Amino acid sequence: MASQGTKRSYEQMETGGERQNANEIRASVGRMVGGIGRFYIQMCTELKLSDNEGRLIQNSITIERMVLSAFDERRNKYLEEHPSTGRDPKKTGGPIYRRRDGKWVRELVLYDKEELRRIWRQANNGEDATAGLTHLMIWHSNLNDATYQRTRALVRTGMDPRMCSLMQGSTLPRRSGAAGAAVKGVGTMVMELIRMIKRGVNDRNFWRGENGRRTRIAYERMCNILKGKFQTAAQRAMMDQVRESRNPGNAEIEDLIFLARSALILRGAVAHKSCLPACVYGLAVASGYDFEREGYSLVGIDPFRLLQNSQVFSIIRPNENPAHKSQLVWMACHSAAFEDLRVSSFIRGTRVLPRGQLSTRGVQIASNENMETMNSSTLELRSRYWAIRTRSGGNTNQQRASAGQVSVQPTFSVQRNLPFERATIMAAFTGNPEGRTSDMRTEIIRMMENSRPEDVSFQGRGVFELSDEKATNPIVPSFDMSNEGSYFFGDNAEEYDN
């Protein structure tokens, strides 16, 4: 991308920092995850969790959600202004699982939000450490991406369920900042914009007055974020049209859906970061590892290293397969829900199955599930190789718009070519070519028709041995190209319900 120089790296977004050199970035990301680790250790002490209980991913998620809730200012303000019976707006809580007499028992804990904020700040040198909070949100978002399909949400906004590979980050909260925006897929941004436009169509005051001005600024900012994800001039020009519209309506919705479809071939640039559960950072800090001094990166070898020697447990329901549960969490840890399964399998060193073949439900356990029958097992989160995370859509060369990988949003910068049925995708474009964006539409469709499935993306990029931390010897894997490796295709995964 030509504008690369004007962009901050992921890590700078992640840590809210201004321009820094590589070492400063590694140190500030290290400071961020070290703070998460220190916070987690302190919470385990507060809740009197044993070592094994502290390594339980369900407990980690509860603790993460509690601190996120404590810092959710908008919602806290809302709760205080709209008190509901039997609910203390100043407290937050969730299920903590403890081992009693060879069984897991659930205990609901309630915690003072003020107290949680104090513990969090104390672990982060007295700062609010928003970057660490965003990091936890992205981990939760990656877990949702690997666990649920968003078919219903896609259909509701008039999009096609086949666009599920564009939906990365669709459950991220609004307050997730620049780091959150970087990991949102094209479909997620389109969906947010369509929802906004629909509100404007139904509510006359949406764009009016002082509030409307703020709404308009938010709308244009979202348009610019989406524009920045596209890599061809025509797609960007169409985004300018959508952004500049006097009062956005159905024409804009049509344009956005068209753009989302086009992103199946002319892929957007979406960032990928390996965000791990808080307990993993906690374990490392507890063992004496100094993240800030050693430095850390979310897109290099570090997360793989960390997972190589972390033991994390999960509660397993009676008919779930522990290996499948491990795969789900592995994918979430590396933000690989939309990666080609062949690439993931090669890196992981064991076969990664499509969602529909996994005997596992989500990681979290509902309050009405019976704990009597639950077991726990160790999650296998290790990998055979590591690879650099990418933010390109896997387009072969930026000079001429060429195909990215369809139904896949690459996570790892690893050479592969892209088996796709252009006919199936082009069938989605039998829409109306009229309207004021017709010339751009024609141009986009032409680029899509000219894209060659046999093109290789990430040429010469490979995976690395775990001993090769400087990434000196790339191993370029060869894949069986007969089947396209999409995780959600032909699937019956549960829907994500808020």
UniProtKB/Swiss-Prot annotation:
Localization terms from the record: Virion; Host nucleus
Function: Encapsidates the negative strand viral RNA, protecting it from nucleases. The encapsidated genomic RNA is termed the ribonucleoprotein (RNP) and serves as template for transcription and replication. The RNP needs to be localized in the host nucleus to start an infectious cycle, but is too large to diffuse through the nuclear pore complex. NP comprises at least 2 nuclear localization signals that are responsible for the active RNP import into the nucleus through cellular importin alpha/beta pathway.
Protein name (record): Nucleoprotein
Single GO term (MF): structural molecule activity
GO biological process: symbiont entry into host cell; viral penetration into host nucleus
Region (Disordered) residue spans: 1-22
GO cellular component entries: helical viral capsid; host cell; host cell nucleus; ribonucleoprotein complex; viral nucleocapsid
Posttranslational modification: Late in virus-infected cells, may be cleaved from a 56-kDa protein to a 53-kDa protein by a cellular caspase. This cleavage might be a marker for the onset of apoptosis in infected cells or have a specific function in virus host interaction.
Quaternary structure, from the entry: Homomultimerizes to form the nucleocapsid. May bind host exportin-1/XPO1. Binds to viral genomic RNA. Protein-RNA contacts are mediated by a combination of electrostatic interactions between positively charged residues and the phosphate backbone and planar interactions between aromatic side chains and bases.
Keyword vocabulary terms for this entry: Capsid protein, Helical capsid protein, Host nucleus, Host-virus interaction, Ribonucleoprotein, RNA-binding, Viral nucleoprotein, Viral penetration into host nucleus, Virion, Virus entry into host cell
Signal sequence residues: none
Renumbered ranges of motif Unconventional nuclear localization signal: 1-18
Motif extent (Bipartite nuclear localization signal): 198-216
Family per record: Belongs to the influenza viruses nucleoprotein family.
HAMAP family: INFV_NCAP (MF_04070)
Domain of life: Viruses
